[in-house]
């Protein structure tokens, strides 16, 4: 299936999502007559002026309808998508997602059966009308570069006057090593490329994005708030509880939404000091007492001049946005927070990645790839329909091109071109699939030779497991981690255990009768 996007953003309707329902995912619309409520919501949740036509809080993707409001492109504070550029950070070594990142960059890790993590920010950009995109890459970038080329340069996407450019870490005369030292340093090292491009394209604002998150967002609503607040920097923030707070950068705001303090992954007393007054959040979420912290989503909007000044002049020796630049910038720059209450999951660890994938199978799902108005894009594939032969399925994601025979699959994600043989049981597992098919004849020859074909052999039982691409798992194998081991390294045997989850390596072979 091929999608054609019209990315002409000079004019046209501006989409404002409306959602009915209870809980944190509800969007609270303001009544025209509720002036006091309007003022409180504007000040406490958005930190400044809001759109002249409709007032809303940005919420989740699970909404039954979309309201259209004509954008007033002639007004002074109108954010023009043609003057916005996006930078997607490819990440470092990806140590927390190892071993999934042993041969690929973090944004190239498969997710949701048929996507890659890079497809999330890329698709959000296109759906927001932003078509001038840079991707910073460094470690194990071959598969990432290949996926971007196949999907976005050959996939039928209409860029109009925009483009997607991959900027890979490279040697410079003044810095022969060439490696990025942090998120900010990756942009600084290519500032000469970006500065020339921004000048030529008349760019005003830059959206900086992460490549290891799962969410749906209209970035232009974030940019619109940034422009109306006349902020130097705007940080997209999500309300979180205490269990998640210490794992993220936290912001503290005043009643106008201005960021007073930014603290990267605080602990103990520092964590407690970052609590936000709940009356600041009560109009954005239903249970502000339960979510008293505001976590930075790693999504920032910078004025172009502010970003260039910070990286080229003011903080030339600082390398990271979260731990170094933003905590200092809040002291002498206008830094605003924009509260996002939709589904957002940082999948930068094995545990969070595993849980986010399995959550896709639940009903109702907190996150849904199926939205015709804001689709997610990935590489076009010419695959046959999945063949199911006497299978039992319960809460399962099954991708294209799979061959499943007399197996039982429950609460699992099955990637493209997966082969599961008769008598197999998969539960609470993520199977990423395969790059290519092995024909029945090829598989039979391998079995006769005592070898293992790609896929899962007969009568194998698997639970609580991630199976990377092209893995070969024999017959009568048991992978359940029955001893409850939390951490283990067995690369010579083709697997690791992280947070109690067994991870079968890419291209690994697990022989017949093995027990893990």
UniProtKB/Swiss-Prot annotation:
<dbReference type="Pfam" id="PF00483">
    <property type="entry name" value="NTP_transferase"/>
</dbReference>
<comment type="subunit">
    <text>Heterotetramer.</text>
</comment>
<dbReference type="GO" id="GO:0005524">
    <property type="term" value="F:ATP binding"/>
</dbReference>
<keyword id="KW-0750">Starch biosynthesis</keyword>
<dbReference type="GO" id="GO:0009501">
    <property type="term" value="C:amyloplast"/>
</dbReference>
<protein>
    <recommendedName>
        <fullName>Glucose-1-phosphate adenylyltransferase large subunit 1, chloroplastic/amyloplastic</fullName>
        <ecNumber>2.7.7.27</ecNumber>
    </recommendedName>
</protein>
<dbReference type="Pfam" id="PF25247">
    <property type="entry name" value="LbH_GLGC"/>
</dbReference>
<dbReference type="InterPro" id="IPR029044">
    <property type="entry name" value="Nucleotide-diphossugar_trans"/>
</dbReference>
<keyword id="KW-0809">Transit peptide</keyword>
<dbReference type="InterPro" id="IPR011004">
    <property type="entry name" value="Trimer_LpxA-like_sf"/>
</dbReference>
<comment type="function">
    <text>This protein plays a role in synthesis of starch. It catalyzes the synthesis of the activated glycosyl donor, ADP-glucose from Glc-1-P and ATP.</text>
</comment>
<dbReference type="GO" id="GO:0005978">
    <property type="term" value="P:glycogen biosynthetic process"/>
</dbReference>
<keyword id="KW-0035">Amyloplast</keyword>
<keyword id="KW-0021">Allosteric enzyme</keyword>
<dbReference type="InterPro" id="IPR005835">
    <property type="entry name" value="NTP_transferase_dom"/>
</dbReference>
<dbReference type="InterPro" id="IPR011831">
    <property type="entry name" value="ADP-Glc_PPase"/>
</dbReference>
<dbReference type="GO" id="GO:0009507">
    <property type="term" value="C:chloroplast"/>
</dbReference>
<dbReference type="GO" id="GO:0008878">
    <property type="term" value="F:glucose-1-phosphate adenylyltransferase activity"/>
</dbReference>
<comment type="similarity">
    <text>Belongs to the bacterial/plant glucose-1-phosphate adenylyltransferase family.</text>
</comment>
<keyword id="KW-0548">Nucleotidyltransferase</keyword>
<keyword id="KW-0547">Nucleotide-binding</keyword>
<keyword id="KW-0150">Chloroplast</keyword>
<dbReference type="GO" id="GO:0019252">
    <property type="term" value="P:starch biosynthetic process"/>
</dbReference>
<keyword id="KW-0934">Plastid</keyword>
<comment type="pathway">
    <text>Glycan biosynthesis; starch biosynthesis.</text>
</comment>
<keyword id="KW-0067">ATP-binding</keyword>
<dbReference type="InterPro" id="IPR005836">
    <property type="entry name" value="ADP_Glu_pyroP_CS"/>
</dbReference>
<keyword id="KW-0808">Transferase</keyword>
<feature type="transit peptide" description="Chloroplast">
    <location>
        <begin position="1"/>
        <end position="45"/>
    </location>
</feature>
């Amino acid at each position: 299936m091929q999608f054609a996007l019209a990315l002409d953003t000079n004019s046209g309707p501006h989409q404002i999502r409306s959602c009915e329902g209870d809980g944190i995912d509800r969007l609270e619309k303001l009544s025209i007559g509720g002036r006091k409520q309007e003022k409180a919501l504007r000040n406490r949740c958005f930190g400044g002026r809001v759109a002249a036509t409709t007032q809303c809080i940005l919420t989740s993707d699970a909404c039954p309808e979309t309201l259209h409001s004509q954008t007033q492109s002639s007004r002074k504070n109108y954010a023009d998508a043609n003057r916005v550029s996006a930078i997607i950070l490819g990440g470092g070594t990806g140590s927390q997602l190892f071993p999934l990142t042993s041969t690929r960059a973090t944004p190239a890790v498969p997710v949701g059966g048929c996507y890659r993590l890079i497809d999330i920010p890329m698709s959000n950009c296109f759906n927001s009308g932003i078509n001038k995109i840079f991707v910073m890459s460094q470690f194990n970038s071959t598969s990432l570069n290949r996926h971007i080329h196949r999907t976005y340069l050959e996939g039928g996407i209409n860029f109009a006057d925009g483009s997607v450019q991959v900027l890979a870490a490279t040697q410079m005369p003044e810095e022969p090593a060439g490696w990025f030292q942090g998120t900010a340093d990756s942009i600084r090292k290519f500032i000469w490329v970006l500065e020339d491009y921004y000048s030529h394209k008349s760019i005003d604002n830059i959206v900086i994005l992460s490549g290891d998150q799962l969410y749906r967002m209209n970035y232009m609503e974030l940019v619109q708030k940034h422009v109306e607040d006349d902020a130097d920097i705007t940080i997209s923030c999500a309300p979180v509880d205490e269990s998640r707070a210490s794992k993220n950068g936290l912001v503290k705001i005043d009643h106008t939404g201005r960021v007073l303090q930014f603290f990267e992954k605080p602990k103990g007393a520092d964590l407690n000091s970052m609590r936000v007054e709940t009356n600041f959040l009560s109009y954005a979420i239903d249970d502000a007492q339960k979510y008293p912290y505001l976590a930075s989503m790693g999504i920032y909007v910078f004025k172009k001049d502010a970003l260039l000044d910070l990286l080229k002049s003011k903080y030339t020796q600082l390398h990271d946005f979260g731990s170094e630049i933003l905590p200092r910038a809040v002291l002498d720059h206008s830094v605003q927070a924009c509260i996002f209450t939709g589904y957002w999951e940082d999948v930068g660890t094995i545990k969070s990645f595993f849980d986010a994938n399995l959550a896709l199978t639940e009903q109702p799902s907190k996150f849904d790839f199926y939205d015709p108005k804001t689709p997610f894009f990935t590489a076009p594939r010419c695959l046959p329909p999945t063949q199911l032969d006497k299978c039992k399925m319960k809460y399962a994601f099954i991708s294209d091109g799979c061959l499943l025979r007399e197996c039982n699959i429950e609460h699992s994600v099955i990637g493209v071109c997966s082969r599961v043989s008769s008598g197999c049981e998969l539960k609470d597992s993520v199977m990423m699939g395969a790059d290519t098919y092995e024909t029945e004849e090829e598989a039979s020859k391998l079995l006769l030779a005592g070898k293992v074909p790609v896929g899962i052999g007969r009568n194998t039982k698997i639970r609580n497991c991630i199976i990377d691409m092209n893995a070969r798992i024999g017959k009568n194998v048991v992978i359940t981690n029955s001893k409850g081991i939390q951490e283990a390294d067995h690369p010579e045997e083709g697997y690791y255990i992280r947070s109690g989850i067994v991870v079968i390596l890419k291209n690994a072979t697990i022989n017949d009768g093995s027990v893990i």
